[in-house]
Amino acid sequence: MRLLSLAGAMALPLCVLAHPTHRTRGIARRGIDLTPYRLPGNAEYTSSRTSAMRSLLFERADGEDYVETAKKVLQSVHPDATFRVIDDHYVGDNGVAHVHLLQTAHGIDIDNANFNVNIDKNGKVLSYGNSFFSGKIPDSDPLTKRSFSDPVEALKAAATGLGIPLTADDVTSEGLDGTTSYTFKGTKGALSDPTADLVYLAKPDNTLALTWRVETDMNSNWLLTYVDAETAETIHGVVDYISDATYQVYPWGLNDPTEGSRQILEDPWDSKASEFTWIGDGKAKYKTTRGNNGIAQSNPDGGDDYLNNHRPESSSLKFVYPYSPNATSPSSYIDASITQLFYTANTYHDLLYTLGFNEKAGNFEANNNGAGGKGNDFVILNAQDGSGTNNAMFGSPPDGRPGRMYMFIWTESNPPRDGSMEAGIVIHEYTHGLSSRLTGGPANARCVDGEESGGMGEGWGDFMATAVRLKSGDTRQTDYTMGAWAANDPKGIRDYPYSTSMTKNPLTYAHLNNVTEVHEGGTIWASMLYEVMWNLIDKHGKNDAPKPDLKDGVPTDGKYLSMKLVMDGMALQPCNPSFIQARDAILDADVALTKSGNQCEIWKGFAKRGLGERAALKNGIRVDSFDVPKGVC
């Protein structure tokens, strides 16, 4: 399972080839290896508890727009910077306003220079994130000098340098916005016409590179490649948007066929979250697995023409199809697979909506029905996708463009198993879309791409999938694995089970020093969140219903409260956060949601796994701390 990975640890000449993909058992990276191009995270997060925030006296003046307050905060930190407000600001269901701003130079975006401000319901600044460029801005205006290469050369450089299977021999470019934005015509191999935008990119040596940001959607890799605009001979970094009626289904809470039997459910949608039901979009009603939140179909050849692919149809809206885990050919139960995938994705959509991932926060819906955000971005749900095996992927572009989920067949058992039948895999993949839309704002899908944030992207998926599958008799002594059924391995596809036992799972913050790929870092992060969740369950109890009970917008139990705080933390944290910054954002989420009612439980959970008060990154080495701040508990 993977989401976009931001690449570019250093600018690499085009003759340097990527290293072979490092694969772990089960859900791993695939396609083009972008590891050499990963950009290091450089964000700062000023939380509500820091002295810098306490000294920040800004409050929203009477009648003042919260966007203006955010501008004042930015200008107090970077008085000489030029910037623009990204048009994706919103007020979350916890009352916190989120404003995202992007630095500019000579009117050109600095694509990885972000600033986000969080303002509470009383108009006070709760926290802010900052990755603005602090070096010297070039004196000359490149738009005046026109000191940049032809964008066609940048497209060809991206294809050659990364080994993108794109034919661009007869390509032409069409200007969209003067001299800074282009669409390419005449290419072959991409799902849509590639584009190029002139942007700056802040480099690790604190200088700016003028680049063409070339977007190429190659199905299993959906790339933004930053090609030097002066020479067209250097790739400075890469982002990949792909991350590794009645329905007969395994109902919500059953992770896979080993946990129970399929049931026939009638009209299982939440009418508040899905006002058009799951099989309508406000314009039409469908008699198939198509609706406002997602369109599910088979995709055996791994292609992109999903609308014309097979999906089950029922004039009576009875999506009831046979399934046996022992069937020798997964294609024999494709209708059951599509129905299960459609059910799981829609149920998760409705749950996330209840917890705050709605239209204005950037959720995935075709028709937002005037509720904010951008529409036309349902999730394309491909069952038994033929573009891979033993894996799953999710592509999450910015708000207003459809997400894509690829569910594969797993061949580590005889007969093979269908990943759509393991709810945890579907939830993990969908959570990539959640974290991508909330972190950095709905309009910026480049903020879960750093060394640590990429790992947390995997960890959030594992955590949410594990929280959903908790059973009524579970306690903090209950352990869970990830992907065990699909992989035909009781140990699952992670190095350790999710457990509160340090014997069964010894992972701490310092283990990040030895991590070689994002799923290993994700296991560490999810292990921390698992500790926090059980601390909150011990305090507030556990609601085993498929949806939370809310009081003034706050879940009344510990399981759903932990999920809500994790989601609210995503919206608060800076673009490409570190573990420490993401921890602080969750603590700030509790400040905003419960008036600091759970600081002790949250701190104890993180501190148990080494992310306590004095945890630090020193000279490239992560140092554990098991301390809880004095006076918190």
Curated annotation (Swiss-Prot):
Broad class of where this protein is predominantly found: secreted
PANTHER family xref list: EXTRACELLULAR METALLOPROTEINASE MEP (PTHR33478:SF1)
Lineage, uppermost ranks: Eukaryota, Fungi, Dikarya, Ascomycota, Pezizomycotina
Name this polypeptide is given: Extracellular metalloproteinase mep
PROSITE patterns: ZINC_PROTEASE (PS00142)
Family: Belongs to the peptidase M36 family.
Places the protein is found: Secreted
Cofactor note: Binds 1 zinc ion per subunit.
Propeptide: 19-244
Function: Secreted metalloproteinase that allows assimilation of proteinaceous substrates.
Active site as annotated: E429
Positions annotated to bind Zn(2+): H428, H432
